[in-house]
Amino acid sequence: MIILHVKVYNLILKTLNKKNQKVRILLNKQLSKYLGIDFGIKKSGVSISDSNKLISFPLETIETKNLLDYIRQISIDENIEIIVIGKPLKLNNEIHGLEEEIVKFIKSLKNYLPNIQVERIDERFTSKISKKIIIKSGIGKKNRRDKLIIDKISASLILESYLIQKNK
């Protein structure tokens, strides 16, 4: 598969006319990416897939109040097709209290970006796994407690789980 830079891709799309709508749709789908979100009340972790939709990469942790604008911009820059948001379930399968806020956020997101599909996936244990990844990576004790790192790695794990499920 050919991997094109987003700016080159956008230029190609602009030059295609209405007669080439099928080519446009195919090109758009092939070069799109997925976004993963570990939603939090104050801060949220964000991750992104490659254009082959096989690998997830932690992006950053941002203030949740700025999340919609951030997603809008990255959706334009990276041609985001699907946003995967973690679903916080307890061990007994009960829904965590944070779910109410996530549902409100998703409603706003769908109004703000109606052409982007939103998917949900169980996010149990992502924070614990993130902490173990950080420990194994050799990051010092002081930086291990940095919630910003944990959130973006958790977002990457959420997206990775979705990609594995989708590519089975």
Q: Could you describe each region identified by the protein language model?
A:
Residues 12-35, 41-42, 47-168:
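Phosphate- and other anionic-substrate recognition elements at nucleic-acid/protein interfaces
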